[in-house]
Design a protein with these regions (language model features):
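Sequence signature of WD/YWTD-type beta-propeller architectures
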Residues: 20-529, 535-543, 547, 552-572
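N-terminal Sec-pathway targeting helices
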Residues: 1-13
């Protein structure tokens, strides 16, 4: 990237950040003289958690000092300090002593102006249950339109929630657009959605986890190649034993990227949800992808699936599908009037959660999950606890991803009365995942910032959740976090992910730079991958090969374009 582009990008992020801060503060003013903003009252911390930052707000300018007192209710330990400013972090050594000497009882935090009469206080406590595993998440700028244009600004990060160090960068910069990732229950395999090109949005990698994970031709697959038509392969999820992947085929979505202004468009910068789709399961041993009977009904969209920990059932989102034009196969709805009706909320789209037997890929009867269906709301993002007892899901008035009103609910896996989690903050609570020991959920929320933060909440054996804590070390200026997923490995385990797969965009970039030697080298690697191409891909490659001086290869791909399926073909025998 040129120096000019870097300056422009930094300037844009700075302006966006300043505006977001102004708007957020305007909407979150506290009428009292001063009030404690964080930690939340009655928050429950993991025993390994590093020292949090204590923050407070005030509407009266204070040039004086503050007195803070942090003490165990049993009287065994206390920390008293006088300081300037509206933020304080105890030393790690004192915080560790406080946690140990609290004996898992109450910890009081008291705040007052130096010499003042009024005191604000909150109570905290430390759980006996550790988190015990790291979290892999995506870090990116907003709005999405900027992230898509600057893939090098997106990273995959791996965080040890008990570490005092910064998160580990597992993959710096994206070579192509990347989205959902999942792990097998034993933490030995990873599945990662990384596009294979502009037209093939169905690229997917499955790899064993090691210190360095290579994404290359050995572990690449394309849902589009298998289906012989364009598909996203939305919300793909590895089975607990790592043998199967449940995904969405024949999918079609409503997608709208909003312009940078107004501010709300920056914060919630995209509308995206599936309106058509069948569930399908890929068997890694047999190398067969087969639609799941009972969850492949044309009249419904069936997507956003997850497994029960025993691998016997699949829980997924279902809604009445939009009709298709049988003459054209599209993965994005093109009817702009229809899209605008969804954007303006003149039309609704609501999902229910269903559960279906896997039955070795033979499926069965899909049944609605009581408490997560038929409630007049949209229910989505099911996540089953590893002990098989609880189902946490999101609920909003409409749609699916990035909903401002998204709230998390919990219900027994067999269905029942759903209960709203106490961990829900004021704006967007979503993309939750269970710790391997079934005692914590990690999730994303805009409740403390218009940039998305990571939070952690305890859930006990009875499904009762505690007040959450903020994962401060995941915060980076001008970046959001999303897609947090636990890896069933020791908390301090790290790995690196490297992308070593060639697609047309790489060759196109080399040709644009007039680096024809590099372009020819990439073309050789591309052919060695035995790539899947649509007709338009063959035409584009033919033109590039001609520019590269490879006339015979150019003619070969021009001829292939005449006999290869077009990306908008509806069906192909």
């Amino acid at each position: 990237m040129s120096k000019t582009n870097i300056i422009i990008a930094v300037s844009v992020f700075a302006v966006i950040s300043a505006v977001l801060l102004f708007v957020f503060n305007r909407h979150s003013r506290i009428p009292n003289d001063f009030a404690i903003r964080y930690p939340f009252n009655k928050a429950l911390f993991p025993p390994e958690f590093p020292a949090p930052s204590f923050e407070w707000t005030t509407e009266v300018k204070n040039n004086g000092s503050w007195e803070v007192l942090l003490e165990t209710a049993n009287g065994k330990y206390s920390i008293h300090e006088v300081l300037k400013g509206n933020r304080w972090t105890p030393s790690e050594s004192k915080w560790d002593s406080l946690k140990v000497l609290s004996d898992f009882g109450k910890i009081w935090f008291r705040l007052s102006r130096e010499g003042g009469a009024r005191t604000e206080k909150i109570v905290l406590s430390v759980s006996r249950d550790s988190v015990g595993a790291p979290v892999l998440y995506r870090q990116m700028p907003i709005p999405f339109i900027i992230a898509e244009r600057r893939l090098d600004s997106m990273n995959f990060m791996l965080i040890n929630l008990g570490s005092k160090s910064k998160p580990h960068t597992a993959m710096k910069g994206f070579p192509v657009c990347g989205n959902c990732h999942s792990f097998s229950g034993d933490g030995n395999n990873i599945g990662l959605d990384l596009d294979a090109g502009l037209r093939d949005k169905g690229g997917y990698f499955i790899s064993p986890i090691s210190d360095t994970i290579m994404f290359n031709k050995e572990n690449f697959m394309s849902w589009s190649r298998i289906e012989k038509k364009r598909t996203f392969g939305l919300f793909s999820k590895l089975s607990p034993d790592g043998r199967y992947v449940v995904t969405t085929v024949r999918d079609r979505v409503i997608m709208k990227n909003f312009p940078v202004n107004p501010v709300e468009n920056i914060v919630f910068s995209q509308l995206f949800f599936p309106v058509n789709g069948h569930l399908a399961v890929y068997d890694r041993q047999e190398k067969i992808l087969k639609e799941l009977p009972g969850a492949n009904l044309e009249e419904y969209v069936q997507s956003n699936a997850t497994w029960t920990p025993d691998g016997k059932y699949i829980v997924y989102s279902r809604a009445a599908a939009l009709p298709r034009d049988s003459n054209i196969y599209e993965i994005n709805v093109q009817d702009q009037d229809l899209i605008d009706q969804y954007v303006s909320r003149k039309k609704s789209f609501k999902y229910d959660l269903y559960i279906i037997p896997f039955n070795n890929g033979n499926g069965g009867e899909a049944k609605p999950v009581r408490g997560a269906s038929g409630n007049g709301k949209s229910n989505y993002f099911p996540a089953v606890s590893p002990d098989g007892k609880w189902l946490v899901f999101c609920q909003a008035e409409n749609f699916m991803l990035l909903m401002p009103d998204s709230r998390m609910y919990i219900v027994p896996i067999g269905g029942g009365k759903a209960r709203e989690l106490r961990g829900n903050l004021s704006r967007m609570n979503s993309w939750h995942a269970w710790s391997p020991n079934s005692r914590w959920i990690v999730y994303a929320s805009k409740g403390m910032s218009l940039y998305t933060d990571m939070f952690l909440a305890h859930i006990d054996e009875n499904g009762e959740d505690a007040i959450p804590v903020l994962v401060e070390k995941a915060r980076v200026p001008y970046r959001v976090i999303n897609y947090p997923e636990f890896v069933n490995r020791k908390a301090g385990y790290t790995f690196n992910m490297k992308y070593d797969y060639v697609e047309l965009a790489h060759i196109k970039r080399a040709v644009a730079d007039r680096d024809y030697e590099k372009a020819r080298e990439l073309f050789g690697r591309l052919e060695d991958q035995n790539p899947f191409f649509f007709s338009e891909d063959c035409t584009e490659l033919s033109d590039m090969l001609k520019t590269m001086g490879l006339a015979s290869e150019s003619e070969k791909y021009a001829e292939m374009a005449k006999h290869t399926i077009n990306s908008n073909v509806f069906d192909q025998e």
